[in-house]
Every structure is written in structure tokens, then in C-alpha cells.
Regions:
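Aromatic- and Lys/Arg-enriched surface recognition patch
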Residues: 123-171
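Short secondary-structure junctions
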Residues: 15-20, 95-99, 137-138
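Catalytic cores of nucleic-acid ligases and guanylyltransferases
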Residues: 29-45, 65, 69, 75-88, ...
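Short, well-ordered loop/turn elements at secondary-structure boundaries
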Residues: 54-55, 67-69, 92-94, 103-106, ...
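Short amphipathic beta-strand starts and helix->beta connectors
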Residues: 52-60, 90-97, 220-225
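Modules that initiate DNA replication and primer synthesis
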Residues: 76-79, 88-91, 105-122, 127, ...
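DNA replication initiation on ssDNA origins
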Residues: 1-71, 80-86, 157, 162-165, ...
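Short beta-strand
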Residues: 61-64, 97-104, 139-143
């Protein structure tokens, strides 16, 4: 396969539609205005070529008509963001992925698979990874676990990297923390593509026995400790879980968790 075909194969997704983004010269709050929309036509090799040449930007819809995926992503839209530090942490965690700079200057953390994985399993594990990174509230692609094609459902698309590949700002980070060329990106995709069963079996940190009935994402957060900056989000989720677990004693239970796991504990006024 040539380089265009390899790039298209990496982002194989929904057959009958794709996304497009038109960027105007007009700016708002320092950012270029963009219009994104779904096109109910297949993502073709010609469209991929135009994307890589910087003519028309495209996006791929990860979830296919069978609710399975060949790729997925975390979309971290917080600033400032250190892509090199995120990439290093993910490699330390031994998570097979490729970190790219997004269109808006955030991070797209792409997961690639050598076989189809169910959208639900992908989203579950991706949420654990996001939580362990400290970005538990970020967007996950696919956004849906299930679509009903017979009623016209189409999943959400994610903008692809390497728009205008020769001088792109949507580049991957290589092992040395440098922007990777398109060819190097495709080498990283090949090297870091993973079997779905291996991906689902990834573990991070310690599991906390007292939260074994809670979601894996929340358990993961308590296993690594709750640093300042993420306490409100995590403790809100914990409050919901406590109400289900101990409806008559949830406030006391929540405060015990707060004192034990938050560093420093969340003030009572919050």
C-alpha cells in the first residue's frame, strides 16, 4: 500500500459517512472559526489525499454499523497541555497508543487495533486510561457504544491528524518528543496497534477492594489517589455511588472517603 492507503487503513470506520471541517480566515477569541459537519458518503482515498495535501480536512467515524471499531481516541481539550509529558506517562503505563496534537492545540490520543473491538469495551478501557492520566472528563471516541443504522444513526467523527502533512500542526509525538513525519506516524501506528483482548486486559495502578462494585474508572482514580484539581469531579461521582450503596448513610461514607483518599481533603463547604 502507498502512504495514502496506509493512512486511510489506520482510520477505518463507518463505511457510509465521514466528517468534514471547513476553516475560515475569521477568528473568534484568538481561534480560527471552523464549521464541522457529517457527509453521508464514504470516506474515499481521494478525500484522504486532499486532507494530507491541506485542501479539505476530513474526519473518520470510529464506530461501524456493527458497533465495532478499528481505532478510538481520547480528546483532551485543556490548556496549556504538555504533549511530550502525556506521551511519556502513557509509555510508562505501557499503553499502546499514539499521541497527536489536535486541530485546536489539545491532544488526540489514538488507539489502534489489529482486529475489530466492540465500541463498549473500547470506551470502558479508554475511560480508565483517561482517569489514570488525570483527564477523566475528556471526550472519548467513539462517543456511542451502539448505533442503529436502520433508523439512520451515524456516530460522531474525529478530525484526522496530518492535515497538510508537509507542514502540519496536527502531528504525532515520537519517542524523542519531536514531531513525527507522516511516514514515522504510520510506523508508530503499525508498531503500537494492539489485539483487542490485550487492550481490554490492561491494568493501571492498584484496585481498591472497598470500591470493587464501583466503575473501573472510579476505582482506578481511588487507586492512584485523588490530587488537587480533580477532587470535585471524582468526589461528585463518588457521592452518586455512595447514595446507591448506602442511601441512609451516604454523607458520612462520602466524608470518610474524602479524608482517606483526597490529597488534601476537600473542604466541607465544597
Amino acid at each position: 500500500m502507498n502512504i495514502d492507503e496506509r493512512f486511510m487503513a489506520a482510520f477505518e470506520g463507518f463505511d457510509a459517512a465521514h466528517g468534514q471541517t471547513q476553516i475560515s480566515d475569521e477568528r473568534r477569541a484568538g481561534k480560527q472559526k471552523a464549521k464541522s459537519y457529517i457527509v453521508r458518503k464514504p470516506l474515499t482515498l481521494d478525500l484522504i489525499r486532499e486532507h494530507l495535501q491541506g485542501l479539505n480536512g476530513v474526519g473518520s467515524i470510529p464506530i461501524n454499523e456493527h458497533n465495532k471499531c478499528k481505532f478510538g481516541a481520547l480528546d483532551i481539550d485543556q490548556y496549556p497541555l504538555d504533549l511530550v509529558a502525556i506521551d511519556k506517562k502513557l509509555r510508562d503505563m505501557e499503553v499502546p497508543c499514539v499521541v497527536c496534537r489536535s486541530k485546536s492545540g489539545g491532544a488526540h490520543i489514538f488507539f489502534f487495533f489489529n482486529d475489530w473491538i466492540s465500541a463498549g469495551e473500547l470506551r470502558d478501557k479508554a475511560s480508565e486510561i483517561a482517569a489514570y492520566l488525570g483527564y477523566g472528563g475528556c471526550e472519548i471516541f467513539p462517543k456511542q457504544e451502539q448505533i442503529l443504522v436502520e433508523r439512520g444513526d451515524v456516530g460522531n467523527f474525529i478530525n484526522l491528524p496530518y492535515f497538510d502533512s508537509e507542514q502540519t500542526l496536527r502531528f504525532a509525538v515520537d519517542e524523542d518528543g519531536e514531531p513525527a513525519s507522516l511516514e514515522r506516524f504510520l510506523e508508530l501506528v503499525s508498531a503500537r496497534s494492539v489485539d483487542p483482548n490485550v487492550f481490554v486486559g490492561l491494568t493501571f495502578g492498584e484496585q481498591v477492594d472497598e470500591f470493587v462494585e464501583w466503575s473501573p474508572c472510579l476505582n482506578c482514580m481511588f487507586g492512584q489517589g485523588i490530587p488537587e484539581g480533580t477532587r470535585n469531579t471524582v468526589m461528585f461521582a463518588a457521592a452518586v455511588a455512595c447514595k446507591k450503596e448506602q442511601p441512609d448513610n451516604w454523607r458520612q461514607r462520602l466524608e470518610e472517603i474524602n479524608m482517606k483518599y483526597c490529597t488534601p481533603p476537600l473542604p466541607a463547604t465544597e
